[in-house]
Amino acid sequence: GLVCLIEEQPAVLICDLPSEENEQFQLKKYGLYALKHTYNQGIIFKGFAVPAENLLQVNRGNGLTIAYHGLNLGRVALCANAAGTMRLMMASMIPWGQFRRTYGEAIADRELVRRRLGRMAGLIVACDALVAWCSTMLDQGYRGEMECIVAKIFGSEAQKEAAIELFMKTHGGRSFLHGHLFGDNVHEYLAPCIYEGEGEMLGMAFFKSLVKHHGSTYFEPIGKALHAAGIKKPNPFNPGHAWALKGPLS
């Protein structure tokens, strides 16, 4: 699927990529710390022809509606991947805790390490629950956009916390050895905070979605009435201002 602009409107096209590069289609190779386990290449299109019948049509919205649906699926997948990744971390922490001894006792018996394992177990269960919730809604035909945003933000932040605060600190200096699960994959653990939408930006988008209906229903008419009356600094104690707002506030 290719997201593009057609007559200044977002659209999605289904396109078949050529088997080799040509003047209209080239691959851009670049270094990337994250996703190093995948075959990652940039794609450059120059006058690339796509049949008109490959344009996807939607009953409501435009191409962004299709793109956002794909993002929703990706955000749920991110949360599911976080749960699986944290399971791998825990599977490494438990035997290490039994092997590593300090002051004559395995660190697995220390309350600090037990707290970390308990915290990670809770994060895993929470991610599993969010995946089940969101995937069920999507399977039933709901857009689930806000729910998937919650899953993405929580899953990425949970994985970051688990990697840095729980996994790395339990393994100590060994975390930075070549071949260690943390050192070899630290960028993979942090990338979800950025990919599929940066977390804090998504949080603001989530809030905007929550208040959009209320704002357009109640506050927008007030703004329009003030603009029509030429009032830039409304004063509720000014009778003229109050009269201008009698409609929206009634």
Language model feature labels by segment:
Residues 145-242:
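Alpha-helix capping/hinge segments and adjacent helical runs
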Residues 1-3, 12-14, 42-44, 152-154, ...:
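Structured core elements
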Residues 1-25:
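A short core secondary-structure module
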Residues 7-8, 38-43, 71, 181, ...:
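Short, solvent-exposed loop/turn segments at the edges of secondary structure
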Residues 98-105, 136-143, 172:
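Short, flexible helix-adjacent loops and helix caps
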Residues 26-123, 192-193, 208, 223-250:
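Glycine-rich beta->alpha junctions and the first turn(s) of the following alpha-helix
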